[in-house]
Every structure is written in C-alpha cells, then in structure tokens.
Amino acid sequence: MKIYDRNRNVLTLGQRVMIAATGALDVLKEAHTDNLTPYEAEHEKCVLLANSRERYAPIELIRLG
C-alpha cells in the first residue's frame, strides 16, 4: 500500500525524510501497513526510520528530495 507524507507525497523505502515535529533527518527503513485501511496507514505509527527507535505516522514526516 502506498503511504503519503503530510504534504501528500508518496513515501518509499530508503527515502530521506524529516520528522516535522523536531526537524531531525532520517531514512525510511520499514513501513508496516498490512491489514490497515488507507486512513489508518496515514495516521497510525507504522513507519520505522533507520536511526530512530520510535515508530512514526507517515503524516508526521516530510519527504526530502
């Protein structure tokens, strides 16, 4: 399933992103969207970043480049 950042840009694995709340830069590592509706996939904390131990909702991220 496609996931979108807060600006409605498609997010893909390996892509650089910025965490909107902190401005920290990271790389999208995994997205666990199995059995989620499109709304849930956008708002649930289902994204893992390479250098962070937390999960993020795609709507909390901004795609870079």
Regions inferred by a protein language model and the residue ranges of each:
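Mixed-charge, Lys/Arg-rich low-complexity intrinsically disordered regions
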Residues: M1-R16
